[in-house]
Amino acid sequence: FYHISTDEVYGALELTRPEGDAAGGESGGGPFGEEFFTEETKYAPHSPYSASKASSDHFVRAYHDTYGMPTLVTNCSNNYGPYQFPEKLIPLFINNIRHRRPLPVYGRGQNVRDWLYVEDHARAIDVIFHRGKVADTYNIGGFNEWKNIDLIRVIVRTVDRLLGNPEGASEKLITYVTDRAGHDMRYAIDSRKLKRELGWQPSLQFEEGIEKTVRWYLENQSWMDDITSGEYQQY
């Protein structure tokens, strides 16, 4: 039994490098702190959502311990890529830019997330399912941290360029809104165990992945429109 979970079960990490690591790029990609979530990090969920995910992890392990069911648990960072439901940040903002709608940013956009291209996540699932150690846990991350506001600006620049808009034309759509309750400051996964034991590592640089993602949504606008209009529910 393969159980896919989230890094949110671990709680939150401190933002000890507010500007990130210069080696990671001008505004993203490098670590924003010294600590990372490992497979040994204690669970400390801060929201009902993450608490429910943590409980599901424990249920899976309990079934292995009690009944001997072969299990695997993975905890991954934020995914992005094609076919993501448009309530999620990246497809939502691509669609909002296309329709000239506001781009809502929680707080001041300083929260940090690690981003993983969905095809890299799928490759990790495949290798863990076939070669992972039964009853073990593996973290899957992109080693690719971005502040929300910096990520949004990358999306804005990419969409504007591909649509032929003047540079920075959609920056004015950024709208700061009240921060979300229980909004953890930083998530960052250490997936070196997965690389060391099973040889997996991300294949795409973020710049390539976000370019592919934006292009996909712009080239598949009918799919997005079908979802956002609710027409898909009539199937």
Language-model features: locations:
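Conserved beta-loop-beta element that borders a ligand/cofactor-binding pocket
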Residues: S5-T6, D57-P82, P166-E167
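Short clusters of hydrophobic/aromatic residues that line enzyme substrate/ligand-binding pockets
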Residues: R17, F32, F36-F37, Y80, ...
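Short, glycine/charged-enriched secondary-structure capping and boundary segments
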Residues: L15-E19, G30-F37, H64, P86-I94, ...
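Active-site loop of short-chain dehydrogenase/reductase
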Residues: F1, G29-G30, M69-P70, P102, ...
